[in-house]
């Protein structure tokens, strides 16, 4: 049986209204077991200031972002289930949910799925990579009972 170990850190001033730990656990379990037997992920919920600082430091972009993924890179001889860390900005997720006409829950789920796929090595820099990753995200989201997360984009509602 596969196992997903979650370390949830709330570093947001406003913890009220956030998804519960069981929600984050369920979303991770919707993604990770199909890729590896045991996975360990840290999810840190932050405010815009920390998101902006990390995004600027690691990506050279001086603005907050929805999710940052930091894969754990162990030496080849070390086998650990630790995949890495997801840093998710509460305010950006909530704002984007409104802009994309999604429920906040759907967008939180999507950010966990999206970030987890980055931890597993998926990317969306090239168009072909983006198509593969978005198709996988859509499949995973739908398997958990959510709509296609890119529906608004496909309908021309967002960029």
Curated annotation (Swiss-Prot):
Q: Which GO terms describe its cellular component?
A: cytoplasm
Where does the UniProt annotation locate this protein?
Cytoplasm
Cofactor(s) in the UniProt record: Zn(2+)
Q: Which residues bind Zn(2+)?
A: 114, 118, 124
* Keywords from the named record: Cytoplasm, Endonuclease, Hydrolase, Metal-binding, Nuclease, Ribosome biogenesis, rRNA processing, Zinc
Name any one Pfam family assigned in the record. Answer: YbeY
Presence of the UniProt keyword Metal-binding in the record: yes
Q: What class of enzyme is it?
A: hydrolase
PROSITE patterns with a match to the protein in the record: UPF0054
- What's this protein's family per the entry? Belongs to the endoribonuclease YbeY family.
What's the protein called, per UniProt?
Endoribonuclease YbeY
Task: Give the originating organism.
Answer: Pectobacterium atrosepticum (strain SCRI 1043 / ATCC BAA-672) (Erwinia carotovora subsp. atroseptica)
Q: What is the lineage of its organism?
A: Bacteria, Pseudomonadati, Pseudomonadota, Gammaproteobacteria, Enterobacterales
Gene name of this polypeptide: ybeY
């Amino acid at each position: 049986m596969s196992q997903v170990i979650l370390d949830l850190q709330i570093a947001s001033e406003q913890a009220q209204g956030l998804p519960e730990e069981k929600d984050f656990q369920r979303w991770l379990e919707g993604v990770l077991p199909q890729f590896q037997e045991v996975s360990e992920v840290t999810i840190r919920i932050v405010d815009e200031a920390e998101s902006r600082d990390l995004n600027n430091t690691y990506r050279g972009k001086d603005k907050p972002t929805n999710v940052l993924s930091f894969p754990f890179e162990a030496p080849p001889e070390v086998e650990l289930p630790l995949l890495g860390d997801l840093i998710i900005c509460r305010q950006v997720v909530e704002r984007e949910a409104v802009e994309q006409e999604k429920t906040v829950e759907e967008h939180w789920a999507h950010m966990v799925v999206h970030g987890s796929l980055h931890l597993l090595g998926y990317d969306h820099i090239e168009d072909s990579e983006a198509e593969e990753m978005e198709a996988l995200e859509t499949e995973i989201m739908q398997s958990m009972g959510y709509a296609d997360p890119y529906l608004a984009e496909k309908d021309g509602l967002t960029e």
